[in-house]
Amino acid sequence: MYRVVTIEEVWDVAKDVKAFRFNENIEFAPGQFIMAWLPGVGEKPFSLAWEDMIVVKRVGPFTTKLFELKEGDRLWIRGPYGHGFIKRGEKVALVGGGIGIPPLYAFAKKNQGKFRQMTLIYGARSKDELSLLDIENYVDDAVITTDDGSAGRKGFPTEVLAERREEFDQVYACGPEPMLKAVLKVMNYKNVQISAERYMKCGIGVCGSCNLGKYLVCRDGPVFEGEKLVGLL
């Protein structure tokens, strides 16, 4: 069930955010996730940023331990699991907030040049917390926001989306739940796909810990069509 990968590269992405590249490529759809396990520590889900990369924010005991890994150390993984983003539309927006960049990064990289227009709208609390990787290389247009105005436009990505929504025939979103709720509201739950997050244990639809109404995020998501989430988010 698990495969053991070796960490080949670790680098800082933003404040308390690191990227880990390992020695094995995983066939995946942008938006899918893996379960990563450390013996004696536990297991957590992570969206794949690329076929050999995850991006991690330090938020608790597991990620703190993960941050100690160095080149040559081992990590146990299983997956990928779940449903990813569906390519749709001609003029699309990728809307992200905080650490929500990995699945959007994967989508942008895999679909570079396949849309008439692909716009990134991404925000974080401050310049130090921008976790962009090099996603700007794969999109046609990028608007960056920060809550405090320390980089890009002061404000929130959903404000930009509200101003420009008529430009897009499909929106892909990942980020904090309040942002996702705002995206769904701006889009009236139509022509939008969101990557949802819930506490997750098994990753395969058995334990039920990641329920979102009648859905299980690990099995039915983590990517959902907006119309399925009316009354749930």
Curated annotation (Swiss-Prot):
Keywords attached to this entry: 2Fe-2S, Electron transport, FAD, Flavoprotein, Iron, Iron-sulfur, Metal-binding, Pyrimidine biosynthesis, Transport
Cofactor(s) in the UniProt record: [2Fe-2S] cluster; FAD
Cofactor binding note: Binds 1 [2Fe-2S] cluster per subunit.
Ranges of residues in domain FAD-binding FR-type: 1-87
Record: residues binding [2Fe-2S] cluster: C202, C207, C210, C218
CDD domains hit by this protein: DHOD_e_trans_like2
Top-level taxon: Archaea
GO annotation terms (biological process): 'de novo' UMP biosynthetic process
Gene Ontology MF annotations: 2 iron, 2 sulfur cluster binding; electron transfer activity; flavin adenine dinucleotide binding; metal ion binding; oxidoreductase activity
Gene3D superfamilies xref list: Dihydroorotate dehydrogenase, electron transfer subunit (2.10.240.10), Nucleotide-binding domain of ferredoxin-NADP reductase (FNR) module (3.40.50.80), Translation factors (2.40.30.10)
Pfam families reported in the protein's UniProt record: DHODB_Fe-S_bind, NAD_binding_1
Pathway in which this enzyme or protein is active: Pyrimidine metabolism; UMP biosynthesis via de novo pathway; orotate from (S)-dihydroorotate (NAD(+) route): step 1/1
Assembly behavior: Heterotetramer of 2 PyrK and 2 PyrD type B subunits.
Similarity comment: family membership: Belongs to the PyrK family.
Reported function: Responsible for channeling the electrons from the oxidation of dihydroorotate from the FMN redox center in the PyrD type B subunit to the ultimate electron acceptor NAD(+).
Name this protein carries in UniProt: Probable dihydroorotate dehydrogenase B (NAD(+)), electron transfer subunit
Species of the source: Thermococcus kodakarensis (strain ATCC BAA-918 / JCM 12380 / KOD1)
